[in-house]
Amino acid sequence: MATELQCPDSMPCHNQQVNSASTPSPEQLRPGDLILDHAGGNRASRAKVILLTGYAHSSLPAELDSGACGGSSLNSEGNSGSGDSSSYDAPAGNSFLEDCELSRQIGAQLKLLPMNDQIRELQTIIRDKTASRGDFMFSADRLIRLVVEEGLNQLPYKECMVTTPTGYKYEGVKFEKGNCGVSIMRSGEAMEQGLRDCCRSIRIGKILIQSDEETQRAKVYYAKFPPDIYRRKVLLMYPILSTGNTVIEAVKVLIEHGVQPSVIILLSLFSTPHGAKSIIQEFPEITILTTEVHPVAPTHFGQKYFGTD
């Protein structure tokens, strides 16, 4: 099961103890820290998601600089083809309590895969600039498969009865009909095979969003969906969430085709805090499923996956 972000009901005073041996003391907390308790009781299954809302642009890692990210255009080929590629400046001046309040608002919508060493290794290889393209693609496909599997777990099932080869009646479940996938080109297409490996007959639509050369605003260049998409639940595939702008435009197009945000599940590998917040603030009913929330997004994903780096 995916894990929801949670914040404490209130911040402890400087002279109060936190009633958990695994929770950092108030002195150890930094503005913007969110404590995430994954499913499982052992120490290895616990992780901290750091929302670095106090960083100014000048103190961000070099990877967040617009030059390092390859420019500020949305979904441009020059910036890894990951689409959501405008440079990310973490908002400054927000307090921890403000982040907690926001996390309460999005807690049920932002879901994280439970962290373990396997997922952590895959994330590490994907972020490693020295990784070969073969290792990168292998690790990316594995991580995509894990995200897709959990995404399918968010879809509705219904009970059914089957008969085994020995004549035994077995009570099980099966998918309710009416699901589809939509990939945001180009990087979202990397996730299509993972979805087809799990659902051989699922229908997949596509949408292409790029920045306008004159206005630099996101513009929809192509959209093709199943004709009855308004009756389906949608797995929206986009591996890297940086600013969230591309996904916001894609959801607007889906809404124009009759899709309700409440039936959209966004499948992502990596997200920045700003990207997740922007999407949820725009569409509070959408569900975001990702493996990591981190201020540095691996925006090279699309270029390296498709061999255009």
Curated annotation (Swiss-Prot):
Binding, 5-phospho-alpha-D-ribose 1-diphosphate: 186, 238-246
Family per record: Belongs to the UPRTase family.
Expression tissues: Highly expressed in leukocytes, liver, spleen and thymus, with lower expression in brain, lung and skeletal muscle.
Species in which this protein is naturally found: Homo sapiens (Human)
Protein name, per record: Uracil phosphoribosyltransferase homolog
Spans traversing the lipid bilayer: none
Modified residues (Phosphoserine): 25
Pfam families the UniProt entry points to: UPRTase
Binding site for uracil: 299-301
Region (Disordered): 1-38
Gene Ontology CC: cytoplasm; intracellular membrane-bounded organelle; nucleoplasm
GO biological process: female pregnancy; lactation; response to insulin; UMP biosynthetic process
Bias kind Polar residues: ranges: 13-26
The keyword Lipoprotein appears for this protein: no
Listed InterPro entries: PRibTrfase_dom, PRTase-like
Keyword Transferase among record annotations: no
Cross-referenced CDD domains: PRTases_typeI
GO molecular function: GTP binding; ribosylnicotinamide kinase activity; ribosylnicotinate kinase activity
Gene3D superfamilies tied to this protein: 3.40.50.2020
Primary location group: cytoplasm
Alphabetical keyword list: Cytoplasm, GTP-binding, Nucleotide-binding, Nucleus, Phosphoprotein
Location relative to the cell: Cytoplasm; Nucleus
Binding site for GTP: 133, 142, 176-179, 203, 232
